[in-house]
Amino acid sequence: MKENELKNEKSVDVLSFKQLESQKIVLPQDLFRSSFTWFCYEIYKSLAFPIWMLLWLPLSVWWKLSNNCIYPLIVSLLVLFLGPIFVLVICGLSRKRSLSKQLIQFCKEVTENTPSSDPHDWEVVAANLNSYLYENKAWNTRYFFFNAMGCQEAFRTTLLEPFSLKKDEAAKVKSFKDSVPYIEEALGVYFREVEKQWKLFNTEKSWSPVGLEDVQLPKDIHRSKLTWFLKRIFTIYSLPLWLAFLNCICVSQHFCLAFRILCPGLFFLMMVWLFQNMRTTALLVKMEHKMQFLLTIINEQESGANGWDEIARKMNRYLFEKKAWKNEEFFFEGIDCEWFFSHFFYRLLSAKKSMWLLPLNVELWPYIKEAQLSRNEESLMKK
């Protein structure tokens, strides 16, 4: 009995120690007022910033010795406005270079701490890497990653996507050299954790729709897709875009007829494109939303266009309840929902390189294939 009590006390001590240890995790987001102040601090501590400041010394001498102030003024303006761009580019390249030299350590941290797709799981990895990079003089501050999401994003862009897109072993060795076995082990750990998360989500965390009979699709409410679209873009958030659009119309009045038609037309098409991609911030940022979308597709019994209408109706309610969207009009209809799945999920399976501002969702590829297969099977069964 006493031995059992001692074991229980030890286990409690270990648990309490782990809880205290997790509470001690301090990231830059806990120290700085915002990501902007952290970013300014990182810029200030970079090598590029003092170089930019030193450029003003010869300019000051030139101003003093020159009889003609026009040329010094032009150069000063160039340094003033192009200098910050130079500093930002150099800092970005330095961060990328520093992290690329520490891929093995990055992989070891992932393997040891077994993070899943939940950003909170990456806090320990981010904190450990911040300390490691500073102590080993790979970075000049203790604040390489601002938060856990920054660390997770670095894992996605530096390891997960580039490595997964390499189809053969030779290409992997050529790009990642000695890091290949460490990356394979880290990705294996990560994929297993995501699989656990998927199974848990499928059995316990999956959202169940209630009162769907009251949910109408926007196609049943609005006269046309154009009126639905215009209603959504006429908001306070899109006011700067509309002001720019009106300015474009006013400026184009001074040019020929073709330009007056072409310029506002292209600007409006750009706004449509921005609107289509704006929805990705609601559905594609959180992993739980993406998993729910795929589960809804897989579990939908109705086939064809009616099936996609049901999926759209369920997701409209889900995103509204989760406060990811301001109303129940995320998808206009089933066709719009099918297009969204095809464009932002299924087509990524054939991607050959990383996409700008759009994750490839490599960890969800098996479930995306399952979702597509379930829709194809439903269509075949109907035929």
UniProtKB/Swiss-Prot annotation:
GO CC list: endosome; fungal-type vacuole; membrane
Cytoplasmic compartment residues: 1-42, 94-232, 276-383
Residues in compartment: Extracellular: 64-72, 254
Localization in the cell: Membrane
Main location: membrane
GO biological process: protein transport to vacuole involved in ubiquitin-dependent protein catabolic process via the multivesicular body sorting pathway
Entry's family note: Belongs to the DUP/COS family.
Protein name according to UniProt: Protein COS5
